[in-house]
Curated annotation (Swiss-Prot):
Chain intervals with Basic and acidic residues compositional bias: 12-28, 56-71
Region: Disordered, residue numbers: 1-71, 352-380
UniProt protein name: Zinc finger CCCH domain-containing protein 15 homolog
Keyword Phosphoprotein: yes
MF term (GO), any: zinc ion binding
Single Gene Ontology BP annotation: cytoplasmic translation
PROSITE patterns: ZF_C3H1
Phosphothreonine PTM positions: 218
Family of this protein: Belongs to the ZC3H15/TMA46 family.
Organism: Drosophila melanogaster
Record PTM Phosphoserine, positions in chain: 221
Composition-biased stretches (Low complexity): 38-50, 352-361, 369-380
Amino acid sequence: MPPKKAPPGPSKKTEQKKKEKVIEDKTFGLKNKKGNKQQKFIQQVQKQVQSGGQHPRQDGDKRKEEKEKKLAEQREMALIFKPVQTQKVEKGTDPKSVVCAFFKQGTCTKGDKCKFSHDLSQENKVEKRSIYVDMRDEDDPMTNWDDAKLKEVVEKKSSGEKQRPTTDIICKFFLEAVEKSKYGWFWECPNGGKCIYRHALPAGYVLKRDKKKEEKPTEISLVDLIEKERAALGPNQTRVTLESFLAWKKRKIAEKKAKLAAEEERKKSDFSKGKQFGISGREMFSFNPDLVDDGPMEEGDAAFDVYNREDDDDNAVEFKELDLAALSLAAKEVDGSGTIASTNRLLDQATEAAKTAAAEDAAADEDGPSSSAPANDAAPINKDLFVDLAGELDDLDLDDEDDD
């Protein structure tokens, strides 16, 4: 018998109507609300109902899980086909100077937390050759000898070849190379590989270039320098005062003017002789004003004239040029009289106050008790002076009305 057909499910229109009914029930009375919160709630309900109650972020989570699954598979394949042995570093070696083996194959998952270096150029960086170790001092045990080396040693001993003596003296070529920073893995001694002198510095040896750095010049402060120069002048010197300074300033200004005048005369004489080196264009026109007239006008030339503009606003303000030399010559010493307090000012004030008090006491003793008693010649006080003042004022008003 053929299998039973599955019962027909609800149509899409029916499902859509159900969803619209659910949305209408949940948002009843909120469609006409214009508040931001109400509108967001309506949109959220519509999205939930349309998506069938599933959270929209589930698709993103699925994609993330699939991506992680693929990465895990790639790691497993890399471990299968590209096995890497665990790196071991000798004691005292910086791990950052060793390139990570997993990083070379692109399988390192530690990133910046990896203790090994992820810089591929680190392999090209070789440790500098030590200047305190002679590479020829390394022991060469017999276990590392080959047949050729063994034969060479036997022949040397049988022939009785004399070995060149060795010494603790440092090779001068080695010292020169170290001082000039030329010593390295590619440096070779001019004496060859059989040089009897040492190619290493003893412990505690200081190079000349390092000595120069250590010998810093003694620094002296500005105050100490001024005091030193003043002491070197000697005791018999002219003291600088305002008058001597102004005289010196005046003499310097005169010397400067004389020097400028002599220089101008020299340039003028050179210009008259045809020498124009070191002469500016302004000086040329000042020495020979005829140079302004450059000949008759030609076709295409523009005519112009120079004149001074007269403006009331410009003439209303008068400007004066300040001459520092004239101001310095007109300077005078400050008169400190009346502005500087004396050292005995407090004692003087106390003495003056004591004198004033003594004078007042003496005057009081001379006057006697009559000075404190009231004077008998004083006019008597009339207590009823203003008693009838109100009546008098009323009489005055009546008189004024009668007059009117």
